[in-house]
C-alpha cells in the first residue's frame, strides 16, 4: 500500500532539512527507516537531517534523525527553520522548542532573522576525553594547531582551532569517531579565527560534512570566548552565510536566517 506524507523542505545556510508534522505520520512507520529513505538525495527528497515536530500546549517538540537513521540530540539550524515554519503557519513569533529535555527559546524578528537562545554549555562532561589524548591525535593531521576543546551544548562537539582542507576534514572527522576517544561519536568543528570572526566547517556525527551547523556555531563561539580568542558579540562564517552570536547571562544566543524551499507530498510504500 502506498501512503502520502506531507513534508516541508527548508535550509539554514545550506544545512537542509525535511520537516514533517507528527500528525501526518502513521504509528506503523519505522521512523528511522523513513528518515533514511526521505533523506536519500537520489531516491528520496534529500536532506542533511529529517525532522519530526509535534505541537503541545505551550511548546513544540522536535525529534531529529540523521541520514543514517540515528537520532540527534540537537540541531540549531533545524530549530531556526522550525521556528520560521511555525511562524509562517500560525503567526507566532515567540516559540518554545523542546528537544529531549533541552528548552530552546526562539524569536522570529522577521522572516529572515530568527533568534534562538540555546542556554548554557558545559566544558566538563563524562564523555569528554582528556585534552592530551585529543591533542595527540589532532597534531598528526593539523598544520598550525592552536587549541582543541570539547563542548557539550546538548550534543557533543569537539572544536579544533586550526586550518584544514575539506578533503582532510572528512578524514579527520571520520577518524575521530574512534570508540577509544568518543564512545558515542562526536561532532567535529574546524575553526579559524580572524578579526573576531570564526570561519567554521563541521563534520557532523551521523551526517558527515555539512554546509553549516548551528549547534557547532554555538559550541565554537562558546569555546572561542572561554579561550579568549574572540569576544561577544561575534560572527560565525559559513560558506552560504553567517550567524550572529552573543552571550547573555551565561546563555548562548544564535541569530540568523532560515529559508523555506518547498512544500510537497512524499509517497511511501508500507
Curated annotation (Swiss-Prot):
GO molecular function: diaminopimelate epimerase activity
Catalytic activity: (2S,6S)-2,6-diaminopimelate = meso-2,6-diaminopimelate
Annotated localization: Cytoplasm
InterPro entries: DAP_epimerase_AS, DAP_epimerase_DapF
Residues reported in the UniProt entry to bind substrate: 15, 49, 66, 76-77, 155, 187, 204-205, 214-215
Pathway this chain belongs to: Amino-acid biosynthesis; L-lysine biosynthesis via DAP pathway; DL-2,6-diaminopimelate from LL-2,6-diaminopimelate: step 1/1
Predominant subcellular localization, coarse grouping: cytoplasm
Documented EC number(s): 5.1.1.7
Enzyme class of the recorded protein, top EC level: isomerase
Record's keyword annotation contains Isomerase: yes
Annotated site, Could be important to modulate the pK values of the two catalytic cysteine residues, chain positions: 157, 204
NCBIfam families for this protein: DapF
Protein name: Diaminopimelate epimerase
Species: Rickettsia massiliae (strain Mtu5)
The gene coding this protein: dapF
Amino acid at each position: 500500500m502506498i501512503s502520502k506524507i506531507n513534508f516541508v523542505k527548508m535550509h539554514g545556510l545550506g544545512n537542509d532539512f525535511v520537516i514533517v508534522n507528527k500528525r501526518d505520520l502513521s504509528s506503523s512507520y519505522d521512523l528511522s527507516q523513513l528518515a533514511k529513505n526521505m533523506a536519500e538525495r537520489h531516491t528520496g527528497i534529500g536532506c542533511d537531517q529529517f525532522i519530526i515536530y509535534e505541537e503541545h500546549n505551550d511548546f513544540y517538540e522536535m525529534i531529529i534523525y540523521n541520514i543514517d537513521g540515528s537520532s540527534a540530540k540537537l540541531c540549531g539550524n533545524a530549530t531556526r527553520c522550525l521556528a520560521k515554519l511555525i511562524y509562517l503557519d500560525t503567526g507566532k513569533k515567540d516559540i518554545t522548542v523542546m528537544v529531549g529535555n533541552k528548552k530552546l527559546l526562539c524569536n522570529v524578528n522577521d522572516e529572515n532573522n530568527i533568534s534562538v537562545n540555546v542556554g548554557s554549555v558545559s566544558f566538563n562532561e563524562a564523555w569528554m576525553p582528556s585534552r592530551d589524548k585529543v591533542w595527540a591525535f589532532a597534531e598528526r593531521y593539523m598544520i598550525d594547531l592552536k587549541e582543541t576543546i570539547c563542548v557539550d551544548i546538548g550534543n557533543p562537539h569537539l572544536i579544533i582551532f586550526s586550518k584544514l582542507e575539506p578533503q582532510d576534514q572528512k578524514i579527520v572527522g571520520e577518524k575521530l569517531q574512534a570508540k577509544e576517544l568518543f564512545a558515542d561519536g562526536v561532532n567535529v568543528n574546524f575553526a579559524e579565527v580572524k578579526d573576531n570572526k570564526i570561519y567554521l566547517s563541521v563534520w557532523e556525527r551521523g551526517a558527515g560534512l555539512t554546509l553549516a551547523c548551528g549547534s557547532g556555531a554555538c559550541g565554537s563561539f562558546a569555546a572561542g570566548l572561554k579561550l579568549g580568542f574572540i569576544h561577544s558579540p561575534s560572527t560565525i562564517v559559513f560558506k552560504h552565510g553567517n550567524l550572529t552570536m552573543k552571550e547573555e547571562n551565561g546563555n548562548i544566543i544564535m541569530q540568523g536566517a532560515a529559508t523555506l524551499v518547498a512544500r510537497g507530498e512524499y509517497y511511501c510504500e508500507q
